[in-house]
Each structure stands twice: as C-alpha cells, then as structure tokens.
Amino acid sequence: MLNNKGFDFWAGDYDKTVGISDEENTYPFAGYKKVLWFIFQTIMRAGNAVVLDIGFGTGTLTTKLYERGCSIYGQDFSSRMIALASEKMPNAQLYQGDFSKGLVEPLRNFRYDYIVATYSLHHLTDAQKSNFLLDLRNYLKENGKIIIGDVAFETRKDLEECKLKAGAVSYTHLTLPTN
C-alpha cells in the first residue's frame, strides 16, 4: 500500500488513473462509477444529509453530494488529496489523519446520517476493518448508515490471486520525491 507521501505524489493523476481502470474494467477500479452512483443515489434519497467520508481522496463522490446540499466531513491521510478536494468543496470540514488509527478528534464531535468509505477500507487488515467499523457506529445519528464501496474478497489470498490474474498495476514502482 502507498503511504501518505505516495498518495500525495499520485494525487494529480489519481482521477485519470481511476477513470482508465474503470473504463478498461480492470483491477482495482472496475465498476467504480457504478459504485459511486449507487452510493450517491442512496444518500440523495435522504435529502440534505450529514456525511462523513473516510478516505475521500480527490472528493469525487463527496463533491457531488456537497453540490446538492449535503454537509460534508472527511478524513484522508494525503495532504495533497485534501487540498484538491478542498478546492471543490470550500466549506467542507476535511481533516488529515490515518484512519487505521481511528477518527481524528474533530470528527469525533459530530454525528452523521451516513458514513461512507469508497475504495479505502481495503488498505486495512481484516481485524482493523472490524474494529474500525464497530467504532464508527458510535458516530451515527439514529437510523444512520455506514455504506462501503470497495474491493472485497473472502480471503486475502483470493485478493492476491485476482490481482495476479488481472495483471494489476503495482504502484510500488513510483519514484517519490526525497523531501
């Protein structure tokens, strides 16, 4: 997995890379637009929802929700991704933090109609996912929902086999800046 510096480096081309993977129906973003559209429609049925996005990246989903009146909160560990998303959503409450360590303090002070995680939770181990999702329940409003749109497999071995079969692109070859 890329660290925050890797995602900072990738941020400028992230949307393009994801779009190509989705269009070519390749791992890991095959079906990306369909997943986001389903989540968008689900949230919009509730009207002006309060939404927390975990690992929001460049804000592809949350920008659409923001433009339609939702209150957006988010946590991402890439400062560059946050900067790009903030340009699109100047009044959103976006914070930097590694969600494998839980929510950052400011986000713990709110309750949400929806907590979404799209293409982010697969970076956690199964145990981390379980603990994190259990903790997130504490931040939902009554009748609130957690919606996950992500790459999912029954076992880690199944995931690795899928990557091999798909000829998945490895981003470990990126040359990162030294500063």
Which residues does each predicted region cover?
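Conserved small/polar residues in nucleotide/adenosyl-binding loops
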Residues: 172-178
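Short catalytic micro-motifs in class I SAM-dependent methyltransferases
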Residues: 119-120
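A short glycine-rich, Lys/Arg-flanked "PGG" loop and its adjoining helix->strand segment in the class I
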Residues: 130-142
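Short amphipathic alpha-helix with an adjacent loop that forms part of the alpha/beta core around
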Residues: 102-110
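Conserved class I S-adenosyl-L-methionine
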Residues: 1-46, 147-169
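Class I SAM-dependent methyltransferase SAM/SAH-binding core
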Residues: 52, 58-103
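A conserved beta-strand element that flanks and buttresses the S-adenosyl-L-methionine
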Residues: 116
